Amino acid sequence: APGETNDQLFVWIPEKKALFPGDNFYKTFPNLYTIRGTPYRDLAGWVNSIDMMRYLEPEYLIPSHTRPLEGRANIYNKLTTYRDGIQYVHDQTVRLMNLGLGPDEIAEKLILPKHLGDSPFLKEFYGTPAWSAKNVFSGYLGWFDGNPSTLKPLQKKEEAENFIKLVGGWDNLFEIAENSYMEGGFQWA
């Protein structure tokens, strides 16, 4: 049951109608991309795995990283919401890729619809739609974002030296950084 990893599995005990979904379901937005680095996680395969779980109509769902759930309708609804969150990220990322947007632009625009974003099973903790969108982009198109300047970018040192010249020297740079910091622009500072 591919999902968080390609070798992921789930365990179904039919006589108890109990399903152990492994790491393919937990009470947080799914880890569709891990910032520590892993091979590409296939969102379509993860969706199919959750669909297989839904098809079984379990009465008990015993995830590895959250409390057990019970009740066929309750479990079906939770699995459906989780599945729909993954599908939404995949489909909207591909749609925006087809419009010519790069990974950073897609990550900025991709927000779950309210009915998905409000689900406690899709709260951002270990993964986010933005990080996941970049994973989908990279999985389908690789690292090139479509901007020719990123094919052979300036070295960081040369870019920094040019930036210092652009703002009028070190003194101006420090003044801009300090003002930004004082205004709450910590990332820019």
Language model: regions and residue ranges:
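Metallo-beta-lactamase
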Residues: 1-99
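Accessory terminal helices/loops
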Residues: 55-60, 68-188
